[in-house]
């Protein structure tokens, strides 16, 4: 059982992968978004390479729990994933994962440049680990 966690942003998609037993998550890459077709192609290749059987996508809800503009964009992209990749998708509340990821990297004393490069992948790891802890 391999689960792929994704943090979908406007410019990048952070990607994390579970271990085969589904206990831990680790960041594997950050996809630089080009266009929908290319983004789906890269995700599909990752799903095939790692034999993924579920995708967990972070849903950026507002602090009061409502669905906002960014959430609508993510939900729309997840519909495109469903149409092109034959893997079930689970949505996971991702409120504050990017803030938490940045805080953890600050505590690790990473430079601003390194944090910027890693933040989406680390956020995807937090999303996936949260999901794994819940199942």
From Swiss-Prot:
Any one GO cellular component localisation term in the record: cytosol
Entry keyword Hydrolase: yes
Principal location: cytoplasm
GO term, biological process aspect, one: rRNA 5'-end processing
Xref: SMART domains: YqgFc
Single GO MF descriptor: nuclease activity
PANTHER family: POLYNUCLEOTIDYL TRANSFERASE, RIBONUCLEASE H-LIKE SUPERFAMILY PROTEIN
Protein's recorded name: Putative pre-16S rRNA nuclease
Native source organism of the sequence: Clostridium acetobutylicum (strain ATCC 824 / DSM 792 / JCM 1419 / IAM 19013 / LMG 5710 / NBRC 13948 / NRRL B-527 / VKM B-1787 / 2291 / W)
Species lineage: Bacteria, Bacillati, Bacillota, Clostridia, Eubacteriales
């Amino acid at each position: 059982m391999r689960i792929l966690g994704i943090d979908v942003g406007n410019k990048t998609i952070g990607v994390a992968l579970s271990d085969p037993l589904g206990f831990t998550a680790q960041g594997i890459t950050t996809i630089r978004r080009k266009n929908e077709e290319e983004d789906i192609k890269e995700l599909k290749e990752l799903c095939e390479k790692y034999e993924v059987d579920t995708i967990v996508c972070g849903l950026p809800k507002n602090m009061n729990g409502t669905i906002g503009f960014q959430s609508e964009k993510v939900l729309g992209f997840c519909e495109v994933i469903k149409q092109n990749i034959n893997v079930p998708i689970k949505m996971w509340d991702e409120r504050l994962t990017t803030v938490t990821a940045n805080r953890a990297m600050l505590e690790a004393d990473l430079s601003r440049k390194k944090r910027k490069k890693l933040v989406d992948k680390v956020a995807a790891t937090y999303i996936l680990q949260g999901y794994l802890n819940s199942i």
